[in-house]
């Protein structure tokens, strides 16, 4: 018997959720007129020509309105509020991540000493760090509980690197003739809200403590703020109020001064909120300094902002409210899927399975009881029933593995419909039961 593929690995939306008509309407609004009032404005430019380095000003202003007034609801005059010059537009979080590493770190000569990555981690982030020169210089830091990290291990590792003899290294090899770049001694990568893969959300105390540590050790914290708006704990017909992003906390508490660059950068995208094919996102820093630096890399200076047209399509969708309606629809659909997945896991999985609450984002993380072998179960499930799971071995920090593949799985709700979710977990549970019988595991 041939089974239909049920794929819990895919971390992108079902095709039916892609807002084709809304994108068509926004594109027509941008390109329909023969001219636009900003076509010859150097800060904006024609949508089909090279953009400015930091991206169209009106789009950045629209994102600021979305963040300040609609989402986080900052009061006028609050230090947390963002401004257009604090943003650098880019072509999505993946490109944004690599650009940050290339423009703010220098592992090649030892100036940037180490990268710290929260584990389990988004598996493809390893490639960005490797491309940026961090192979052999990545340390995994465990999460603790549902809202914190292993601070003891982080501080111990930092102190160890501080105590080691350091090569005489400068940042000269990364500096250009017109802009003095801020280069950090350490870098950290994390997803503070509805993390991929664990689903965890850091407490305010955890966020503040991380920033304090970053300031002490000259560390840049790169936060993937890509899931925090996909909150399923509040009504889907109104925008949620996410936890403060770490860049907001850093901005509101940072010492004032023109030479400040801060210790955080928000790496955000509209891929999870509208459609990944648009390839559009933005960096947000505490002030204009780091945002400007990120906009002055060689590729940006050569070709301008990498998503000039698509940034304006998204800007128009934000202006018209179409983007907000897309978000509401996604939250409604994903919330239902999250409920079905949680119910199915409780119904079909072995007694003692640890299930992380799926309160937002795409993923939940489950841990089977001792003696079960996650990699073996996922292999059997794929071969026998065509159910594709991502066992924990996919979410390691390369070079500092924690054996997540022994007992853990990440499950995604973004791609599958509710019937497939329930059926897939039923088959998952059946294979676990068979595995237990074969291996004499007490159920």
Swiss-Prot record:
Q: Where is the signal peptide?
A: none
Q: Which InterPro entries match?
A: Aminotransferase_I/II_large, PyrdxlP-dep_Trfase, PyrdxlP-dep_Trfase_major, PyrdxlP-dep_Trfase_small
Alphabetical GO biological process terms: biosynthetic process
Q: Under the GO molecular function aspect, what terms does this record hold?
A: 2-aminoadipate transaminase activity; pyridoxal phosphate binding
Q: Which GO terms describe its cellular component?
A: cytoplasm; nucleus
Other known facts: Present with 1390 molecules/cell in log phase SD medium.
**Mind telling me what this protein is named?**
Uncharacterized protein YER152C
């Amino acid at each position: 018997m041939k089974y239909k593929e049920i794929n819990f690995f895919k971390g992108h939306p079902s095709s039916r959720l892609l807002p084709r008509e809304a994108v068509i309407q926004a594109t027509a609004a941008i390109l329909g007129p023969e001219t636009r009032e900003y076509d010859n404005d150097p800060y904006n430019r024609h949508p089909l020509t090279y953009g400015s380095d930091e991206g169209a000003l009106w789009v950045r202003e629209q994102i600021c309105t979305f963040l300040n007034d609609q989402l986080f609801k900052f009061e006028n005059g609050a230090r947390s509020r963002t401004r257009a010059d604090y943003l650098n537009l880019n072509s999505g979080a993946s490109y944004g991540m690599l650009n940050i590493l290339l423009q703010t770190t220098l592992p090649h000569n030892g100036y940037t000493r180490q990268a710290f990555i929260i584990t389990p981690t988004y598996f493809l982030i390893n490639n960005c760090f490797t491309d940026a020169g961090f192979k052999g210089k990545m340390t995994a830091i465990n999460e603790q509980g549902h809202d914190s990290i292993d601070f003891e291990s982080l501080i111990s590792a930092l102190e160890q690197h501080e105590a080691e003899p350091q090569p005489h290294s400068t940042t000269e090899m990364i500096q250009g003739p017109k802009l003095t770049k801020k280069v950090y001694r350490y870098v950290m990568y994390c997803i503070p809200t509805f993390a991929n893969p664990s689903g965890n959300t850091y407490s305010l105390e955890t966020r503040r403590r991380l920033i304090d540590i970053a300031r002490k050790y000259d560390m840049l914290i790169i936060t993937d703020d890509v899931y925090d708006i996909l909150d399923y704990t509040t009504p889907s017909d109104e925008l949620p109020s996410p936890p403060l992003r770490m860049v907001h906390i850093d901005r509101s508490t940072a010492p004032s001064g023109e030479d400040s660059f801060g210790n955080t950068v928000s790496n955000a995208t509209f891929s999870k909120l509208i459609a990944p094919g648009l390839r559009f996102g933005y960096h947000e820093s505490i002030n204009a300094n780091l945002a400007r630096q990120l906009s002055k890399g060689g590729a940006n200076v050569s070709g301008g902002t990498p998503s000039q047209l698509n940034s304006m399509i998204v800007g128009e969708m934000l202006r018209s409210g179409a983007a907000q309606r897309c978000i509401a629809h996604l939250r409604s659909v994903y919330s239902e899927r999250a409920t079905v997945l949680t119910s199915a896991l409780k119904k079909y999985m072995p007694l003692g399975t640890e299930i992380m609450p799926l309160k937002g984002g795409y993923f939940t993380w489950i841990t089977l009881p001792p003696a079960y072998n996650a990699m073996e179960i996922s292999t059997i499930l794929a071969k026998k029933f065509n159910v594709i799971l991502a066992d924990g071995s996919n979410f390691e920090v390369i070079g500092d593995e924690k054996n997540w593949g022994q007992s853990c799985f990440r499950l995604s709700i973004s791609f599958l419909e509710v019937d497939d979710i329930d059926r897939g977990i039923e088959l998952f549970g059946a294979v676990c039961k068979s595995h237990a019988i074969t291996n004499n595991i007490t159920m």
